[in-house]
Each structure stands twice: as C-alpha cells, then as structure tokens.
Amino acid sequence: MEPGTKYREKGNTRMTEMMQQLKKIGIVPVVVLNDAKDALPLGEKLMECGLPCAEVTFRTAAAEESIRKMAKAYPDMIIGAGTVLTCEQADRAIDAGAKFIVSPGFNPKVTEYVLKKGVPMTPGVCTPTEIEAAMEFGLDVLKFFPAEPSGGLKMIKALAAPYVGLNFMPTGGINAANVRDYLAYDRIVACGGSWMVAGNLVKEGKFDEIGRLVKEAADIVKEIRG
C-alpha cells in the first residue's frame, strides 16, 4: 500500500483545500491568548486587515474558549489550533471549531488520531527522519519548526530537494524583515509568525496597532505573490 493511503480518502481533500486557502493568505498569525475576551477584537482586526486566519496556540487556559468565540463570530475565518500535544487537546480544539491542527513536533499517535477524524494536520519537523515518518501518513505539507534556529530557508531548500512534492509551513523566528525571502520560495505554503499579534500588544489592548501590522504583513504577501 502506498504510504498514507488509508488516511487520504477521508482527509486529503480537506487538507488540499485548506492548504490552497492558506497559500493565498500567505502568513498565518500565531496567537497566544491569555484572556478569551481578546479573541473577538483580535479576530476582527485579522479579518478586516487582510489575514483572515489564525493559529491559536494551546499554551494557555484561554485557548479553547478563544477558538470557540472566534469560530462562532467569524465563520469564514480559517482558525486552527497550535501547540497541540495530545489527543485530548485535539478533541477540545476540534470541538471548539478549529479547522486545522498544528503541533510543534511529529507525534505519530496524535497525527493518526487527528487524520482519522478527517481534520487537516500539520505536524512539526526539522530532520529527514521526521519528514519521512510524517510522509508515511500521506502528509505533503509539514511545519518546519523552529525555522530560523534550525537553519532557516537554506535548510528548507536542502530538505526540499530529495522530497519532491513536499511543501512547508515554517514557523519560529520569522518576522517582517525576513518573511519576504520565505514567501518567494515556491515550496512554502505559508509562514507562521507572531510579530503582528505580539502578546504585549494584545495584553495592552492595542488592536489598532495590531491591525496596522496585520495590513503591513498582508501587503508583503501581495508584493511577493501578487
């Protein structure tokens, strides 16, 4: 049996459609919310200013409720859950309305669990061994994490060479100064970044500033990808 075949029938179409949508958006804001009350004003700025998506990390107690609020208020927004480490967290995220799941590393148990539910999953990898293990699940888009500390774009290009058809979503150390280089490489679907949704800006309620940074990021995508 071809690697990953048993997972494709249920989830591959959704995965492909999701990745096509994310490629158009280009940059996925990686959000850490400590208070669910910030979810709606943040979601509003993301929708209004050109990046209608978010990876809400499961690092805080407010993550689940934040996803639920954003998913209900902005049904057209592509909301995912990041830093998902367990099957229990995956269930909570999906039940709250997450449309895709992201993990910092490759956990076969969690990956299989999410894919069997037919939900798009992007596990993190940074070595050939991890890539090949993930490809056994039929995945052709993987998170490259942590991007900059692991060699950045140069490393991604080196890894991409032997794995024809594999694409990446790099996260970690990507910012307004280096994101153009990543976006210009055709094997990158989208970049994850938190500079436009920095925790201090959210905490201080500076949503107009967040909106400005989001628009600036969206304009970079247009500049590079048209």
What are these regions, as identified by a protein language model?
Residues 168-176:
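Active-site glycine- and acidic-residue-rich loops that bind
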Residues 104-110, 143-152, 187-206:
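Glycine-rich phosphate-binding active-site loops on the catalytic face of alpha/beta enzymes
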Residues 11-96, 116, 176, 204-225:
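Conserved N-terminal beta1-alpha1 strand-loop-helix module at the mouth
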Residues 2-14:
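Short, Lys/Arg-enriched N-terminal segments with co-localized hydrophobic residues
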Residues 31-32, 53-60, 77-85, 98-106, ...:
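Catalytic beta/alpha-barrel core
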Residues 86-96, 129-137, 175-189:
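Catalytic cores of alpha/beta
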